[in-house]
């Protein structure tokens, strides 16, 4: 009995997929990457923004075709789209045999067995349920880096975001559970742990009564075979001295912070339900750079939020120009059902949203090139990810680069390197988002 998984959306969703794979492996199921060979196809979906929702729907419909044209006997849909739109999916896509909500993925084995027996099965548990599996997950990232999801849900309730509705309130995983998971990953050869959650910076508040991210990082850093620890999804207003100190002083922690700010206009930040002002954002950025001069800061922005004026947009451009983020991504605003922002007045035309996004990215391209050129002549550590076929060039990442969202370091050498090796590289050339270097002797 062969199962194929399609995992869509964010890295948090990927962790859920890997957990489901681990559960099924321990129940004796086999896996395939070929949808034509699969007896069961499972799609773990996303619906964070319109494009993600559409990708999920298109993928479900594509996989549904294999119930007619392939070996597929059952189609299972899990994740955010299944949780939010389970009634609509059951009505509109009858080929779907089972639905699993975001807090129900640990029941995947029972679901598979049920649908193979010809029984329909939908399990949409309360989004606030915290799933902790005993089964070791299956690594799908290549084996040298992995995501460690330290919490579920979110309590911030930004006006544009549906995450609290589909992922529930903020729930931290117990520290001992996370340390055990990290130890298991290290035993499998993982070198880089990437801490993720809807928000990492308030880890522990709900179960320990105070923020405990810094303490968690210290415990993870004590694991022998973990070489790098990277922290994503930090809310700027929650970055405290304890976190800054552990990033500064713990050698295994990458001098890198992903800190989504979404906008730089005070009026738009307020409409978004964000809890910072432009000046407060400047203050935390300056504080991070004063304490950790070589820190790489990544952020994300949203253009075209309802009511965004040309003046608001220019404030964003000025902020990007002044703050010089090392890494930056931009999304156009996507109105989501059942969110306050979707019914706000002064919705922005798609063309204007895209023009403003392009303007920010054009500016950031210049900033990124300047930042890259500053690296020329420096020697840095790189984690090797692979080799370009028929070329003496390896592909790696520096501490400044998170996988899948940032750039690469192309390393020229005739040495025999392995994926997962961490090597010293001298930077010889720079592009907007990537670096070129040579292996140090």
Report the location of each language-model feature:
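Conserved glycine-rich "GG(E/T)P / GGGxP" loop and the immediately following alpha-helix
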Residues: 47-52, 190-215, 219, 223, ...
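Conserved, mostly hydrophobic/aromatic
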Residues: 178, 195, 231, 259, ...
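Terminal RNA-binding accessory module
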Residues: 343-441
